[in-house]
UniProtKB/Swiss-Prot annotation:
Main localization, broad class: plastid
Biological role stated in the UniProt entry: NDH shuttles electrons from NAD(P)H:plastoquinone, via FMN and iron-sulfur (Fe-S) centers, to quinones in the photosynthetic chain and possibly in a chloroplast respiratory chain. The immediate electron acceptor for the enzyme in this species is believed to be plastoquinone. Couples the redox reaction to proton translocation, and thus conserves the redox energy in a proton gradient.
Name listed for the protein in its UniProt record: NAD(P)H-quinone oxidoreductase subunit 6, chloroplastic
Keywords on record: Chloroplast, Membrane, NAD, NADP, Plastid, Plastoquinone, Quinone, Thylakoid, Translocase, Transmembrane, Transmembrane helix, Transport
GO MF, one example: NADH dehydrogenase (ubiquinone) activity
Any one annotated GO CC term: chloroplast thylakoid membrane
TM annotation in the entry: 10-30, 32-52, 61-81, 107-127, 152-172
Membrane topology: Multi-pass membrane protein
Subcellular location: Plastid, Chloroplast thylakoid membrane
The reaction(s) this protein catalyses: a plastoquinone + NADH + (n+1) H(+)(in) = a plastoquinol + NAD(+) + n H(+)(out); a plastoquinone + NADPH + (n+1) H(+)(in) = a plastoquinol + NADP(+) + n H(+)(out)
EC number(s) recorded for this UniProt protein: 7.1.1.-
Family label: Belongs to the complex I subunit 6 family.
InterPro entries according to UniProt: NAD(P)H-Q_Oxidoreduct_6 (IPR050290), NADH_UbQ/plastoQ_OxRdtase_su6 (IPR001457), Nuo/plastoQ_OxRdtase_6_NuoJ (IPR042106)
Length: 176
């Protein structure tokens, strides 16, 4: 998507804010239904991050798979939970929670300082020009198809066999 610079930046800021607010909603909301819907917002924002970089197929695939299937499955599973059994032994704050939040906060601040102090100019311009021309000649779907049929053929087939085994196992468990 060829957007002007300020519009592109504003779009990324709004997607980032939606991602942060949705992530906070997943963690902080006590109702599991609201938390699952916040996870849906996070997954939508992640899939929409691919649109400004002209990866429409990846955005559509993530939107269909994660939001359309995984999040609906999570909401469906949360609906079957019995909420009363989880809220009986609820402690507001434990020592493990404090240690975990301290570790996560220190990792967050170290990542922020690393990103802030990194010179991104040299990283952006290291791509060779012939790679850019080769990528522009084919669409995203063609690039994915070429990569799956050549470089990633064996891993693709192994993943399909693993998924088939998981499906057969799920059917066998459902029959019992």
């Amino acid at each position: 998507m060829d957007l002007p610079g300020p519009i592109h930046d504003i779009l990324l800021v709004f997607l980032g804010l939606g991602l942060i607010l949705g992530g906070l909603g997943v963690v902080l909301l006590t109702n599991p239904i609201y938390s699952a819907f916040s996870l849906g917002l996070v997954l939508v924002c992640i899939s929409l991050f691919h649109i400004p970089s002209n990866s429409y197929f990846v955005a559509a695939a993530q939107l269909l798979i994660y939001v359309g299937a995984v999040n609906v499955l999570i909401v469906f599973a949360v609906m079957f939970m019995n909420g009363s059994e989880y809220s009986n032994d609820f402690h507001l704050w434990t020592v493990g929670d404090g240690v975990t939040s301290l570790v996560c906060t220190s990792i967050l601040f170290s990542l922020i300082t690393t990103i802030w102090n990194t010179s991104w100019y040299g990283i952006i311009w290291t791509t060779r020009s012939n790679q850019i021309i080769e990528q522009d000649l084919t669409s995203n779907v063609q690039q994915i198809g070429i990569r799956l049929a050549t470089d990633f053929y064996l891993p693709f087939e192994l993943i399909s066999i693993i998924l088939l085994a998981a499906l057969i196992g799920a059917i066998a468990m459902a029959r019992q």
